[in-house]
UniProtKB/Swiss-Prot annotation:
The chain crosses the membrane at residues 29-49. Its EC number is 2.4.99.28. Belongs to the glycosyltransferase 51 family. It is found in: Cell inner membrane. GO terms for biological process: cell wall organization; peptidoglycan biosynthetic process; regulation of cell shape. This is Biosynthetic peptidoglycan transglycosylase. SUPFAM superfamilies: Lysozyme-like. Pfam families: Transgly.
Length: 239
C-alpha cells in the first residue's frame, strides 16, 4: 500500500511538472508571437506592405494581380475622403473601434457592419479574409496596437494601397488605372466616389461601368465626403 501511495504521488508530481512546463512554453510562445507581431506592425509603419495573404490567394485564383503602391501624397485627397465617408465616417474620432456603429450593427442584426477602416486594414495587411472567430480575435488584439503605433494618415495610406477595387486589382493606383485610365492623383470627385462605392463588394460592383445601385451609392458618398471635409472629420488624414 505504501509503495502504491508513493508511486501515485510521483505520478501526480510528474503530471504537475509537465503541466507547468507546458504552461511555460505556451506563455513563451505567446510572448514570442506577440513580439513578432509588434515588430511586423512597426515595420509596416514605415515600409510599403509587400503583399498580403488575400493578394496571394487572388494571384493563385486569377493567375495574376494588378497592383502599384503609391504614397498618400500621390492619391487624390477626394478619394481618401470618399473612402472614409463610405466605409468609416468617424475614422478620425475613434481608436480603432467605432462602438456606436458596432452597437447599431448588433441591434440591426447586421451580418456586416461596425468594422472600421482600422479593422479592415489589419484584416487586409496582416490576416486573412473569411469569417472566423480566430481571425476576429486576432483582429481585435492587433487593431489597438496598430492604432497606437501608426498615425491615422498611415492607416488610411495602407488601406488605400491594399484594398481591392476590382477582381485582382489592389490599391488606389491600380484601381484608378483599371477603371478610368488615370493615376490615383488625378481622380475626379465623381470617379473617387464610384471607386469608394465598389469597396464593399469589388467582385460584383464595377466603378468603370456602374450599375444604378453603384451610381446611387456614389452620389451618397460624394455628399458624405463633402460633409466630413466641412465638419473636420477628415482633418486627421488631410495634407
Amino acid at each position: 500500500m505504501a509503495k502504491r501511495a508513493r508511486k501515485s504521488k510521483k505520478n501526480v508530481s510528474r503530471a504537475r511538472l509537465l503541466a507547468q512546463a507546458m504552461r511555460r512554453w505556451l506563455l513563451r510562445g505567446m510572448f514570442g508571437l506577440g513580439a513578432l507581431m509588434l515588430v511586423w506592425i512597426v515595420a509596416y509603419a514605415v515600409v510599403p506592405v509587400p503583399t498580403t495573404i488575400y493578394m496571394q490567394q487572388e494571384r493563385a485564383r486569377l493567375g495574376g494581380i494588378e497592383r502599384d503602391w503609391v504614397p498618400m501624397d500621390q492619391i487624390a485627397p477626394v478619394l481618401a475622403r470618399s473612402v472614409v465617408a463610405a466605409e468609416d465616417a468617424n475614422f478620425c474620432l475613434h481608436w480603432g473601434f467605432d462602438m456606436t456603429a458596432i452597437r447599431d450593427a448588433i441591434a440591426d442584426g447586421a451580418a456586416r457592419g461596425g468594422s472600421t477602416i482600422s479593422q479592415q486594414t489589419v484584416k487586409n495587411a496582416f490576416l486573412w479574409h473569411g469569417r472566423s472567430w480566430v481571425r476576429k480575435a486576432l483582429e481585435a488584439a492587433i487593431t489597438p496596437v496598430m492604432e497606437l503605433v501608426w498615425p491615422k494618415r498611415r492607416v488610411l495610406e495602407v488601406y488605400l494601397n491594399v484594398a481591392e477595387f476590382a477582381p485582382g486589382v489592389f490599391g488606389a493606383e491600380a484601381g484608378a488605372q483599371h477603371h478610368f485610365g488615370v493615376s490615383a492623383a488625378d481622380l475626379t470627385a465623381r470617379q473617387a466616389s464610384l471607386m469608394a462605392a465598389v469597396l464593399p463588394n469589388p467582385q460584383r460592383r464595377d466603378a468603370g461601368s456602374p450599375s444604378d445601385l453603384v451610381n446611387r451609392r456614389a452620389r451618397s458618398i460624394a455628399d458624405g465626403a463633402a460633409l466630413i471635409r466641412a465638419d473636420g472629420r477628415a482633418d486627421c488624414f488631410a495634407n
